[in-house]
From Swiss-Prot:
Name used for this protein in its record: Capsid-associated protein VP80
Purpose of the protein: Structural protein that plays a role in the packaging of nucleocapsids and in their egress from the nucleus toward the cell periphery.
Composition bias, Acidic residues: 450-464
GO biological process: exit of virus from host cell nucleus by nuclear egress
GO molecular function, one term: DNA binding
Gene name in the database record: VP80
Self-association state and partner proteins as the record states: Homodimer. Interacts with host nuclear F-actin.
Entry keyword Lipid biosynthesis: no
Domain of life: Viruses
Taxonomy of the source species: Viruses, Viruses incertae sedis, Naldaviricetes, Lefavirales, Baculoviridae
Localization: Host nucleus; Virion
Keywords, ordered alphabetically: Capsid protein, DNA-binding, Host nucleus, Virion
Record's GO cellular component terms: host cell nucleus; viral capsid; virion component
Amino acid sequence: MNDSNSLLITRLAAQILSRNMQTVDVIVDDKTLSLEEKIDTLTSMVLAVNSPPQSPPRVTSSDLAASIIKNNSKMVGNDFEMRYNVLRMAVVFVKHYPKYYNETTAGLVAEIESNLLQYQNYVNQGNYQNIEGYDSLLNKAEECYVKIDRLFKESIKKIMDDTEAFEREQEAERLRAEQTAANALLERRAQTSADDVVNRADANIPTAFSDPLPGPSAPRYMYESSESDTYMETARRTAEHYTDQDKDYNAAYTADEYNSLVKTVLLRLIEKALATLKNRLHITTIDQLKKFRDYLNSDADAGEFQIFLNQEDCVILKNLSNLASKFFNVRCVADTLEVMLEALRNNIELVQPESDAVRRIVIKMTQEIKDSSTPLYNIAMYKSDYDAIKNKNIKTLFDLYNDRLPINFLDTSATSPVRKTSGKRSAEDDLLPTRSSKRANRPEINVISSEDEQEDDDVEDVDYEKESKRRKLEDEDFLKLKALEFSKDIVNEKLQKIIVVTDGMKRLYEYCNCKNSLETLPSAANYGSLLKRLNLYNLDHIEMNVNFYELLFPLTLYNDNDNSDKTLSHQLVNYIFLASNYFQNCAKNFNYMRETFNVFGPFKQIDFMVMFVIKFNFLCDMRNFAKLIDELVPNKQPNMRIHSVLVMRDKIVKLAFSNLQFQTFSKKDKSRNTKHLQRLIMLMNANYNVI
């Protein structure tokens, strides 16, 4: 009985001190051990808690740490891992607290990260002979955090001791809370009015404005008005007096080759710039600095990396650019369209505060323009939307695009649409009616001044209803106008091109079993031979989105010969729904198709191959449907009923594919020329200039 009590007491003590319940239970339940052996084993576990560590564990798992440390207990492994994880959490906390992540703390944070990186690399090498080296790295990191903590406490104490400063801080907190509430209210109102936005012209234009909107709950850009005016003013003054200095800069700059000191100084300067100048630097520079920081932490070869900093920011970051250019390929250049799009692609939250039309255009740019070889497309937008852009980087993007291909700016107050920096207009454009010219033929609306608006709310309501109706009429006319412009080409030729190009792909039919059905997913078994054939070519010319509107627009130019017989209209509408459901189903099961198709590989460009099969299967089916109506005579204007259905389904298809994340690939080996696939790929991208 006494021995049983001793075992229970020893078991309880071992569970409390070692905190390893599972191991203690295994020892107690082991029937091969006697009672005394169990007590001795548990006692040794308790005594091992205070034993000195012989080697450090890996930082990724406590179980793995205990297995790789020689003659050590799990308690020691837990201690190392706990200290490491606490420091990692501390770094994340400080970086996400912008009020205290300033020039001083940025340097300390960089030192902590440098010590943790050295510690992790040292542990993963598997050399455990010098335990003092491990402990010294963690101690250095902990000392830096103690300094940060002391700075926090001093700033809090200073505020608490100064009554006026404390009141100002409380007022700033109140302003931040009010701003947050106001932003939430605006988002709720925007969500409530989402149905009205669908009926507006800028939401229905099926060219530049056809991309889906990000959800209202998407994070807003942190550089905008989420912080109080007091904090923003402080950040502005800090940026004006910024000094690009570091205590070890001279020693690092005089180094003959890249070493750990140069790396540490560069990381400190980068963190300092990102923490202090986030409102002043161009987004391209910020994006490049983040990539540079990640590259430095990866310890890759210095000769394989290059960055492009904005030439204006290089003046501010003189020391950083000079030191980096000594060991890396660093260039100070003017922003280009491709570099700006890459930066916005990585910081898409920048576009959140902008208007709906601007967001759609920017998102479409980031999705479709991959590099300098990608052809640009025509963009039309209201001049008022351009003038209302809040973020300077977004406005710079439009300016860069306009320099390459003039944007068609629609002036709501003038008599004709205007192009920025270009006064040329074709004679064909002069013959087309504009939204503003149609507005000029309508009776004018009396504009109520702000004083009258306050005096008479009833008049305001009446005028608002009139204005809303007027805008809807204008939008409908403008939508018809854009559709008419798009239908200038003879639709018979477009359908004929689909038939000719797809019939010419007999070599591809030999490698697959094309079911010509949109009711099911393309099967990997039916396309296995085709996938192996496609792997020989570079397929990066395939657009990773679906130009649903452009592909099916030719169908909108057909009407029923007899108004009483709606058979043809029903067939066209049903086919549009069938095609949209097919693409939605493919987008929903894209990951599944990727896995099943890759069984025949593996393939480096699997995502492009899946998209090729999705579009190829669709073109096979549309070829058969086009033959049914190819002999009919099309109209010069679209059937608005069918056109409205197409616009609606286009938005749904775009939304389905915009939520996908695709894998890029780098194909360095030589690939075959895709010349005989060029026409088919152009047709997949809705480019009818194939013949």
